[in-house]
């Protein structure tokens, strides 16, 4: 299954708030959800929705998500917690969480177009796994800085997780440590997803 490129608000109406997918929110007065999706929720449907939230928020394909679940399953800690840590330490997600891009797809495009450096080297793989003490910066050219400038100007420093630090003047961010569960930017029950 390929990456989703369709209407984003349709997914947000169905699954709830997905801050990595888009900044837009559906109209509050819409009662479409009540009209079409009322009734008892089955266990399968609840688990599927949790999986879809995870998939659409981080912009993953089905195969990528299964690969991350397989890696997390081999760990000695809780599978759900390790899975969220793996997804949060992806380069495209860290660029988004640092405020260098307004959405995760926007961050993925910055990385793919070679505007982002990790420890002084160009990295053009969005799924690159960042480690503690990695320094994420933009290229020194004016074009790269201009792309990041608008997002950083509208970024709220209060939303920055505790495992990251950012220097907005130098367009630089630092990964200090591995993420705690409470700082994940998505409201999700990872146990339901792992059961799926």
From Swiss-Prot:
One of its GO terms (cellular component) is chloroplast. Keywords: Chloroplast, Plastid, Ribonucleoprotein, Ribosomal protein, RNA-binding, rRNA-binding. It is found in: Plastid, Chloroplast. PROSITE patterns: RIBOSOMAL_S4, S4. GO terms for molecular function: rRNA binding; structural constituent of ribosome. One of its GO terms (biological process) is ribosomal small subunit biogenesis. It comes from the Eukaryota. CDD domains: S4. Residues 89-150 form the S4 RNA-binding domain. Part of the 30S ribosomal subunit. Contacts protein S5. The interaction surface between S4 and S5 is involved in control of translational fidelity. Belongs to the universal ribosomal protein uS4 family. One of the primary rRNA binding proteins, it binds directly to 16S rRNA where it nucleates assembly of the body of the 30S subunit. This is Small ribosomal subunit protein uS4c. The lineage of its organism: Eukaryota, Viridiplantae, Streptophyta, Embryophyta, Tracheophyta. The gene is rps4.
């Amino acid at each position: 299954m390929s990456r989703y490129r369709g209407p984003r608000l349709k997914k947000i109406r169905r699954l709830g708030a997905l801050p990595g997918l888009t900044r837009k929110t559906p109209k509050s007065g819409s009662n479409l959800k009540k009209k079409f999706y009322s009734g008892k929720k089955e266990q399968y449907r609840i688990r599927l929705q949790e999986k879809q939230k995870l998939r659409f928020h981080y912009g993953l394909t089905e195969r990528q998500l299964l690969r991350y679940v397989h890696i997390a399953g081999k760990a000695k800690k809780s599978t759900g917690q390790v899975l969220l840590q793996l997804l949060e330490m992806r380069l495209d997600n860290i660029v988004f969480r640092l405020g260098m891009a307004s959405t995760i797809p926007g961050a993925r495009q910055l990385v793919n177009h070679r505007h982002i450096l990790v420890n002084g080297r160009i990295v053009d793989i969005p799924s690159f796994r960042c480690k503690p003490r990695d320094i994420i910066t933009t290229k020194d050219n004016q074009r790269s800085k201009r792309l990041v400038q608008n997002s950083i100007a509208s970024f709220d420093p209060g939303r920055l997780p505790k495992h990251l630090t950012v220097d907005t003047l130098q367009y630089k961010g630092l990964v200090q440590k591995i993420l705690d569960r409470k700082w994940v930017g998505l409201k999700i029950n990872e146990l339901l997803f792992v059961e799926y």
